[in-house]
């Protein structure tokens, strides 16, 4: 078994396609449940953000697992399998590990170096764990990816240039209406993105923030946090949105809803009471879109959506920081894979030692039968001597096979041990199933590919 990644992101598809593939927690649970119905898939989790949808799965066979995942995503999105594969990328085994480490480090983000994706990876894993859809392989992979992401951000300067999507949107807004200091804002959505938007607005010197959220208590908690920055803030339910737009200079919407929450009628009603003509900037960070597409056609309204953000020149990361981050990822990938290969040979080594112990015990029993009058102290000395001899004979080859197994292709040494000592594969598998350190994963050198589900 090995890890298979099937994904679509801002690098491979336009926003319209990402919208079709966008998922909420309920969708993700259904997708994973459908994927796991196949005997070819044993573990799975979904990483879904505003600019990517990726399924990580442990599969019994590459092509079979790929077909299962592709068909499930095709059914979910309403896209034909043929159309979906035009925008999909596939990574397998080592390439899948490298990709997740790069994603967690912010190297694959729309804005390189942003830290928000690290939290998104953490939530994807936590959700899968709570639904019991990850086992040992994805557990260890996810935990290592999170550790790698933290290391990259702590040891390099990549996050200094890695502004969030919110920061890029606000930069575009300032180009349109000038500095945000002293202005009034509306934040639609009080989740993690809404909180990030409020923080960025506070840093920009905004004077007042109105929070609009379906759950008023959650909106009030965010408003209270905003007031901690010394900024006036109140929370409102959704039906208060139109009048709040009347005095607003900028709106940031990021609810994660499956359909638009800011309608053309809402904006019409809000602007109808504006005393003096002014520009209203609406940053639509939802995926799918939070704002009705028709709103962009209103005079004086400037909509910044994900399409626009992804076309913007992103914050430039210093070459040295990016190179340092990639170097860390490469080192961590190599260490992780070496550890997995050693973990795979460990059950064979354990089975060999158990086989040797069984032989020793059988011979001691034979000794007891042949020399029933043997003094117990002499018998113990013989037993200890035999065990020491066996341990010394096995020490060098078992240590060496673990060292050799850490290199690519090292599984051949475990196979040689099994062959030379006639170790039953069922016995090895039984040991593997009982050891917490064992990992399922046949790290085959399969290529990273960017489509082909149709062969």
UniProtKB/Swiss-Prot annotation:
InterPro entries, alphabetized: 4pyrrol_synth_GluRdtase (IPR000343), 4pyrrol_synth_GluRdtase_dimer (IPR015896), 4pyrrol_synth_GluRdtase_N (IPR015895), GluRdtase_CS (IPR018214), GluRdtase_dimer_dom_sf (IPR036453), GluRdtase_N_sf (IPR036343), NAD(P)-bd_dom_sf (IPR036291), Shikm_DH/Glu-tRNA_Rdtase (IPR006151)
Give the metabolic or biological pathway: Porphyrin-containing compound metabolism; protoporphyrin-IX biosynthesis; 5-aminolevulinate from L-glutamyl-tRNA(Glu): step 1/2
Q: Which SUPFAM superfamilies match?
A: Glutamyl tRNA-reductase catalytic, N-terminal domain, Glutamyl tRNA-reductase dimerization domain, NAD(P)-binding Rossmann-fold domains
GO biological process annotations for this chain's record? protoporphyrinogen IX biosynthetic process from glutamate
Q: Which domain of life is it from?
A: Bacteria
Q: What is its EC number?
A: 1.2.1.70
Quote the Pfam families the UniProt record gives: GlutR_dimer (PF00745), GlutR_N (PF05201), Shikimate_DH (PF01488)
Q: Which residues bind NADP(+)?
A: 189-194
What catalytic activity is recorded? (S)-4-amino-5-oxopentanoate + tRNA(Glu) + NADP(+) = L-glutamyl-tRNA(Glu) + NADPH + H(+)
Assembly information from the UniProt record: Homodimer.
Any idea what this protein is called? Glutamyl-tRNA reductase
What gene is it encoded by?
hemA
């Amino acid at each position: 078994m090995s890890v298979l990644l099937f994904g679509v992101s801002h690098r491979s598809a336009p926003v319209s396609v990402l919208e079709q593939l966008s998922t909420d927690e309920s969708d993700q649970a259904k997708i994973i449940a459908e994927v796991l119905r196949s005997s070819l898939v044993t573990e799975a989790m979904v990483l879904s953000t505003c600019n990517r949808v990726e399924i990580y799965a442990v599969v019994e066979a590459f092509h079979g697992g790929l077909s299962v995942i592709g068909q499930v995503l095709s059914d979910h999105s309403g896209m034909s399998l043929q159309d979906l594969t035009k925008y999909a990328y596939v990574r397998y085994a080592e390439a899948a590990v490298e990709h997740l480490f790069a994603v967690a480090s912010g190297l694959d983000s729309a804005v390189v170096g942003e830290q928000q994706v690290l939290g998104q990876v953490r939530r994807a894993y936590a959700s899968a764990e709570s639904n019991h859809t990850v086992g040992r392989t994805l557990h260890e992979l996810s935990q290592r990816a999170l550790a790698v992401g933290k290391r990259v951000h702590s040891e390099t300067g990549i996050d200094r240039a890695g502004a969030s999507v919110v920061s890029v949107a606000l930069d575009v807004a300032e180009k349109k209406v000038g500095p945000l200091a002293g202005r009034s804002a509306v934040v639609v959505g009080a989740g993690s993105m809404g909180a990030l938007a409020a923080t960025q607005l506070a840093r920009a010197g905004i004077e007042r923030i109105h929070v609009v959220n379906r759950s008023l208590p959650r909106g009030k908690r965010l408003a209270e946090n905003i007031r901690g920055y010394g900024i006036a803030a109140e929370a409102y339910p959704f039906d208060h949105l139109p009048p709040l737009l009347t005095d607003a200079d900028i709106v940031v919407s990021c609810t994660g809803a499956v359909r638009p929450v800011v309608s053309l009628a809402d904006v019409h009603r809000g602007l109808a009471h504006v005393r003096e003509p002014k520009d209203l900037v609406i940053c639509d960070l939802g995926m799918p879109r939070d704002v009705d597409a028709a709103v962009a056609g209103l005079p004086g309204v400037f909509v910044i959506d994900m399409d626009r953000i992804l076309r913007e020149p992103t914050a430039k990361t210093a070459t040295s920081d990016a190179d340092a981050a990639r170097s860390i990822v490469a080192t961590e990938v190599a260490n992780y894979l070496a550890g997995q290969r050693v973990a795979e040979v460990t059950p064979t080594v354990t089975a060999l030692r158990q086989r040797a112990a069984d032989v020793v015990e059988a011979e001691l029993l034979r000794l007891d039968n042949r020399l029933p009058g043997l003094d117990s102290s002499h018998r113990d000395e013989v037993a200890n001597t035999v065990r020491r001899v066996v341990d010394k004979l096995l020490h060098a080859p078992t240590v060496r096979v673990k060292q050799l197994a850490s290199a690519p292709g090292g599984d051949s040494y475990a196979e040689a041990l099994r062959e030379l000592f006639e170790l039953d594969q069922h016995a090895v598998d039984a040991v593997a199933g009982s050891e917490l350190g064992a990992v399922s994963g046949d790290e085959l050198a399969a290529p990273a590919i960017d489509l082909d589900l149709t062969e």
